[in-house]
């Protein structure tokens, strides 16, 4: 679970929960197959689809501060009837 950093709870990600889509921030080196296996084994759910993306880096900030870490997020779509209760998500 070291590569699975935290769940993302933004307005958009909360609206995706109605479609059984959960958003997590992940380690940037994790692959889709590793992430799928990790979610399925840890939460005992079936993942049917995944989308991954990197958050954009603001060039103005990058120029002043230097190189920033890119953050990788994945959206997992679960099988009908499956859900991840937020009480079981412990990212400490």
Swiss-Prot record:
KW Protease (keyword) present: no
Superkingdom to which the source organism belongs: Eukaryota
Pfam families hit by this protein: Ribosomal_L23
GO annotation, cellular component aspect: chloroplast; ribonucleoprotein complex; ribosome
GO BP, one annotated term: translation
Cell compartment(s), UniProt: Plastid, Chloroplast
Family under the similarity heading: Belongs to the universal ribosomal protein uL23 family.
Subunit structure: Part of the 50S ribosomal subunit.
Cited HAMAP family: Ribosomal_uL23_B
UniProt name for this protein: Large ribosomal subunit protein uL23c
Organism name: Chara vulgaris (Common stonewort)
Gene: rpl23
């Amino acid at each position: 679970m070291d590569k699975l950093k935290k769940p993302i709870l933004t307005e958009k990600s909360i609206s995706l929960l109605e479609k059984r889509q959960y958003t997590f921030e992940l380690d940037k080196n994790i692959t889709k197959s590793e992430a799928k296996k990790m979610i399925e084994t840890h939460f005992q759910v079936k993942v049917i689809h995944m989308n991954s993306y990197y958050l954009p880096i603001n060039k103005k900030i990058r120029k002043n501060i230097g190189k920033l870490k890119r953050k990788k997020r994945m959206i997992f779509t679960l099988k009908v009837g499956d859900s991840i209760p937020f009480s079981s998500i412990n990212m400490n």
